[in-house]
Amino acid sequence: MEISTENWCKKPKNRSIFSKNISFQKQNKSTEEPPSSVQKLLASLQQAQNKSDLSEQPSTSKPKKNEKRKKAVAQAPASAPAPGPEEKKKQPKRASVGARMQQQAENARISQTKRPRQVSTSKGSSRNTTAPEQQNYQQQQQQYKGPRIPTDILDELEFRFISNMVECEINDNIRVCFHLELAHWYYIDHMVEDDKISGCPNVGSRDFNFQMCQHCRVLRKYAHRADEVLAKFREYKSTVPTYGAILVDPEMDHVVLVQSYFAKGKNWGFPKGKINQAEPPRDAAIRETFEETGFDFGIYSEKEKKFQRFINDGMVRLYLVKNVPKDFNFQPQTRKEIRKIEWFKIDDLPTDKTDELPAYLQGNKFYMVMPFVKDIQIYVQKEKEKLRRRKAEAVQSTPSSSIFSQLFPAQPPPPVPEDATPTRPMYKRLTSEELFSAFKNPPAGEVARPTLPDMSPAVNGLDTLAVLGICTPLKPGASLNEFSGAPQNCPMISEEAGSPADPSAEIGFAMPMDLKQPVVTSDHPWQHHKISDSSAPPQTLESHQGWLDTQLVNTIMHSPNHPLPPTSNSPATPTAVLGHLIGKPIQPQAILPQAATPTALGSAEKPKSSRISLSDNSAFKAISSTQKQSIPKATAAPPSTEKTRSASLSGSSQVVGKPARNLFNSVVSPVSSGIQSIQGDGGAWEDVWFREQLAATTTAGTSISSLAASNQELAMINREETPIEDPYFKQQAYQKAQKAQSLIPACSQWTNSIKLDIDYVVGPLSFWMQQFSTKSPVSGTGPQLP
């Protein structure tokens, strides 16, 4: 098979011409604009493809020459002449296609990472920028800010909204934007539209925020990124929960919708708004509804049905409020927030975009209403069914046969006209004067007992309320509405009506008269409080009739409450006794002086220092006498019988004709008394020490033990001749006493006379007489003892 060389020669020529055209086009484009990195990459790929196509052809001498010529023409510029053979040899070899592509990718990466230098507005960086660059930057900033707000206006806005911000809010972008939003609203409402203030341009939130950040010192750190902060704030605000209300009329046929002031077109929605920080959801709904409509549903209803939906990644919760009067004058409480407020029929509202609107609703948009319409219609239908069912049950219900139905016969409701609509009573906010006036008590003449219908059968003199147990029975012959006022000489409970001061009339039966006032002795320091007749009952205090026991309150209020002096030896007698309130009242009487009787803990004291005292911390407490004597150990003489003895309960004495108890619980320890036999006994020492601690605790503490108190009480009141035996002390005390019969009791150890052994101390007397005798020779060394 022969291959013609002419065809092979033609193909390279055509390809070379095509490649020349491509190279010329690329060179023309490069003269117009510099090639980008992408264009360079495409060109290198095209060249690599052409090279691969040529390499697939058969290798002959002529194609090789043509290929070299084609490469030289493609690489040479359009205006430059074709290089000669010598110049071709001098040209350096170019890198491979892969190396060139890697280099181009590296250059593109470096060009993308480089950012244009930003000119700083701080004072320290102004020296690094030239004057033209600074001037251009200021011109750009001036165009960015828009109309300039006066400086004094910015100062006032900073004082109102920025100066009071805490540090944590200043460092929070979102909280700063919330404060700037409030400042912008205040600027538009009170400064731009005020004729008295001139030079306040109407700027948008973007320009306003930038000027405030430039003016306020604490917000200057946000000036260079005001757009970024504002974008984050708008994104965050779209996720803040929204709360509002669905206001429905009493018939539940119509609902209130509002139109925003800046809304484009006739867009309608429910009154709602964003919740504030740390605000309860229901309070936020009440606040937003009141700001947009002037209707405060917080005083109209206590519990509402809630509807909740998520719209554009934001939660919207609405509270359905029923029985809203249709004649209420809705007025927005904020400026430039609500344009219109109207009633719409619930059944005519669309539930989807494809629903056809009635003719009178054509042109209106309900995009923010449609997600809730279907749920509202279902709820309204159920409520209407419940209302019809209740009316039917009320008509078919029969009166009950209980006793209350006989006492209170059911009366038919007044006729209601057909055209009348059920309305809920209107309430208003009370002022402080109206609120406190409601707690004032009416005069005594205006207070009356509740009236009841006639009973069947009628019984003369029967108090219906007393039979039912509602009120206290009245005094026979007293009128239902006649009450006596409270006396002026003492404070009384003014919450109930007064009544006569007759005790039998107050409680309905005669009170027992066997309760007597405690007798006060002549030496009592409160003798001026005593009445003339000591056995007369206490003076009755006037009180009024009521369900509370006011006699108890008045008795406590009028009883003298003076504390006893600590040095008083008079009997402690209560000043008032509430015997009718206690099942078995305590009636302490004055105790006459009697002979002392041994008690459970030792000998009884004299009557003057052994009285019963009703104190706050103990039911019965023995009052310690103030005539205690401090006697040194084994040095003082025995006291006389005329003086008052110590009030210690651990003393031991013997009374003529009465048995005595010798207990080893003296205040003198065995160590100080020097009793060897007691110390030597193994168990006696522990028993003596325990009894000393018990006596010291009961004497020095605020109250004595229950066992000692009960024994002391019986000893003081009964005064029996037979001593009261204590089983606790009887078991061991008598055993110790039998062992120590030959010893001197510890409690009387200090009463013995002291005798010094003179012979043991100074020696025999004969020795001293011999030493100082004139007959004996005088010794220079002095007396010497044997």
Curated annotation (Swiss-Prot):
Superkingdom: Eukaryota
A GO CC term attached to the entry: P granule
Organism the protein comes from: Caenorhabditis elegans
Single biological process term from Gene Ontology: regulation of locomotion
Biased composition annotated in UniProt, kind: Basic residues: 62-72
CDD domains per UniProt: NUDIX_Dcp2p_Nudt20
Annotated EC: 3.6.1.62
Record field: catalytic activity: a 5'-end (N(7)-methyl 5'-triphosphoguanosine)-ribonucleoside in mRNA + H2O = N(7)-methyl-GDP + a 5'-end phospho-ribonucleoside in mRNA + 2 H(+); a 5'-end (N(2),N(2),N(7)-trimethyl 5'-triphosphoguanosine)-ribonucleoside in mRNA + H2O = N(2),N(2),N(7)-trimethyl-GDP + a 5'-end phospho-ribonucleoside in mRNA + 2 H(+)
Gene Ontology MF: a single term: manganese ion binding
Alphabetically ordered keywords of this record: Cytoplasm, Hydrolase, Magnesium, Manganese, Metal-binding, mRNA processing, Nonsense-mediated mRNA decay, RNA-binding
Placement of sequence motif Nudix box: 273-294
Spans annotated as Disordered: 25-148, 556-576, 623-655
Polar residues composition bias: residue spans: 25-61, 101-111, 118-133, 623-632, 646-655
Pfam families: DCP2, NUDIX
Protein name: m7GpppN-mRNA hydrolase dcap-2
Cofactor: Mg(2+); Mn(2+)
Family: Belongs to the Nudix hydrolase family. DCP2 subfamily.
Regulation: Inhibited by capped and uncapped RNA. Not inhibited by dinucleotide cap or methylated nucleotide analogs.
Knockout or disruption consequences: Double RNAi-mediated knockdown with dcap-1 reduces survival at 20 degrees Celsius.
Subcellular location: Cytoplasmic granule; Cytoplasm, Perinuclear region
Assembly and binders: May be a component of the decapping complex composed of dcap-1 and dcap-2.
Entry binding sites for Mg(2+): 288, 292
Tissues in which the UniProt entry reports expression: Expressed in sensory neurons.
